[in-house]
Amino acid sequence: MKLMETLNQCINAGHEMTKAIAIAQFNDDSPEARKITRRWRIGEAADLVGVSSQAIRDAEKAGRLPHPDMEIRGRVEQRVGYTIEQINHMRDVFGTRLRRAEDVFPPVIGVAAHKGGVYKTSVSVHLAQDLALKGLRVLLVEGNDPQGTASMYHGWVPDLHIHAEDTLLPFYLGEKDDVTYAIKPTCWPGLDIIPSCLALHRIETELMGKFDEGKLPTDPHLMLRLAIETVAHDYDVIVIDSAPNLGIGTINVVCAADVLIVPTPAELFDYTSALQFFDMLRDLLKNVDLKGFEPDVRILLTKYSNSNGSQSPWMEEQIRDAWGSMVLKNVVRETDEVGKGQIRMRTVFEQAIDQRSSTGAWRNALSIWEPVCNEIFDRLIKPRWEIR
């Protein structure tokens, strides 16, 4: 069998498998089939809205809120919980929805590393969904990653639903004046995505040539920042997922970000890999005019293990000694639920009761991601815009 024939068979079989997984999970392989079926109990909803459970009951009784969805369990009628849409409506009724001030640019959070397998996309996706769960308007951007994993999490399968013209590529190459054409909705209210596909790798070979031809409106390394500026007014926060490399695309992510989060597993070789990332990034940026776009850098320890014999606690101590306040307080502990979430095409924030491995495993995963996302919000996002 010739190589091209082999590759075509692999590609076709891979697309069919992806479709089959989506159909098994959502009864359809279209992005529109993605639904959040999770319901939040009244106490959980109250915490998200920022009021008491009694305040919600009183508002429902007074007609300020709709009567809650109910179901019969045995002989008892009980609440089935609230959808995220209903929770956002509560925020509007109680006046607790968070918004940045109109005259403040939305914080841009970039997540980058120069190797795969460090939970980079998991961090980007969980952070974006957590911010949407908080009621914010969020744009998740596949800045330069042709793999499109963040897109797949939200039902947009690269090279099946998404092609070159649907990505940032036309803007990068000077063919579009803004990026509204590339924005796609997700099943999360308030969360949009700019997806990617394999064609996005062309920026590494074509971007500099377009600049030399005078076809770009700004310097090549500032194109992503310019892209974000064309749509920033519609969002409270922007999250960028980066490719695991140090090409011109990653330089764009660095220059577009207000905060650059570098996921770093608490293992020796991964620590040295992060050090190499900083070393190479410094060398690449030596002769680049950043035009004032210089992000704050933070380290997020990932794949942390508390098991007997694990090197994670020792490595955490070394990393904190070396990088001090750059290292975030919370860590992403290792859990099988991250991998299982990929198979389910759902993060821990989306999973309904019947979509979890077990209640205990789900709660453990939630206890990992919530503190991490809350710390990023409280320390790195809130200070950058006024909350009204």
From Swiss-Prot:
Family: Belongs to the ParA family.
Described function: This protein is essential for plasmid partition. It ensures the proper distribution of newly replicated plasmids to daughter cells during cell division. SopA is trans-acting.
GO BP field: plasmid partitioning
Gene responsible for this protein: sopA
Secretion signal, residue range per the UniProt entry: none
Stated name of the protein: Protein SopA
UniProt-listed PANTHER family: P-LOOP CONTAINING NUCLEOSIDE TRIPHOSPHATE HYDROLASE (PTHR13696), PARA FAMILY PROTEIN CT_582 (PTHR13696:SF52)
InterPro entries: AAA_dom, DNA_Partitioning_ATPase, P-loop_NTPase
Keywords: Plasmid, Plasmid partition
